[in-house]
């Protein structure tokens, strides 16, 4: 910053869940890439960030895509479908039959996957079909969302040929492709304070 004759206080450290160094109604735009889905209290964090924005200010941030779970063909898919089908409400023998359907593709531990979710790091997933209303309740109007980190096949295929997998993934990257609702593991939300 000094080298380019910019004020050195433009960049500073603060708590993104409870920001204290920025005054309320003082910021035009807040960019939170790869941060907000680690918040222990997402709604409170978004409210705290929104307070810092000027009227009509923008909050742009990334979220993990809950709908991606359904196409992973692993324990993420099972978790997603358990929620949709309300498995907890089924009688015991049906729960067992249902669980047996997933025996073939939920054993992630057999393949050594390097994934932050296996390291006990807390993170949230959000549904791109419902995020607009969720943010509206928090004082933000969703202007758009944009998908990224597309997966051309279930994630386990990356272990078979990582370079090829990434090559075909890059070819798919298109933030407005409808397939992103299912094939992208993350999305960016662009909101305006209302």
Residue ranges and their predicted role:
Residues 43-58:
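A short glycine-rich, Lys/Arg-flanked "PGG" loop and its adjoining helix->strand segment in the class I
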Residues 58-101:
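Conserved class I S-adenosyl-L-methionine
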Residues 18-24:
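Short conserved loop adjoining the S-adenosyl-L-methionine
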Residues 5-18:
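Conserved SAM-binding strand-loop segment of SAM-dependent methyltransferases
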Residues 110-137, 142-194:
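A C-terminal cap/extension of S-adenosyl-L-methionine-dependent methyltransferases
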Residues 34-35:
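Short catalytic micro-motifs in class I SAM-dependent methyltransferases
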Residues 1-2:
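Conserved SAM-binding loop
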Residues 31:
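A conserved beta-strand element that flanks and buttresses the S-adenosyl-L-methionine
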């Amino acid at each position: 910053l000094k080298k380019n004759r910019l004020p050195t206080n433009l960049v500073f450290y603060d708590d993104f869940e409870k920001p204290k160094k920025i005054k309320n109604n003082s910021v035009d735009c807040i960019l939170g890439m790869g941060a907000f889905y680690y918040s222990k209290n997402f709604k409170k964090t978004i409210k705290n960030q929104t307070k810092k924005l000027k009227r009509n200010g923008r909050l742009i941030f990334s979220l993990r895509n809950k709908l991606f779970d359904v196409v992973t063909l692993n324990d993420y898919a099972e978790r997603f479908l358990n929620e949709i089908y309300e498995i907890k409400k089924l009688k015991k023998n049906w729960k067992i039959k249902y669980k047996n359907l997933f025996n073939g593709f939920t054993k992630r531990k057999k393949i050594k996957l390097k994934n932050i979710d296996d390291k006990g790091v807390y993170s949230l997933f959000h549904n791109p079909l419902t995020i607009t209303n969720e943010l509206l309740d928090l004082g933000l109007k969703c202007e758009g969302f944009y998908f990224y980190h597309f997966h051309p096949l279930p994630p386990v295929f990356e272990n078979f040929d990582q370079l090829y997998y990434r090559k075909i993934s890059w070819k798919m990257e298109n933030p407005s492709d409808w397939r992103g609702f299912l094939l992208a593991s993350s999305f960016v939300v662009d909101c305006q304070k209302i």
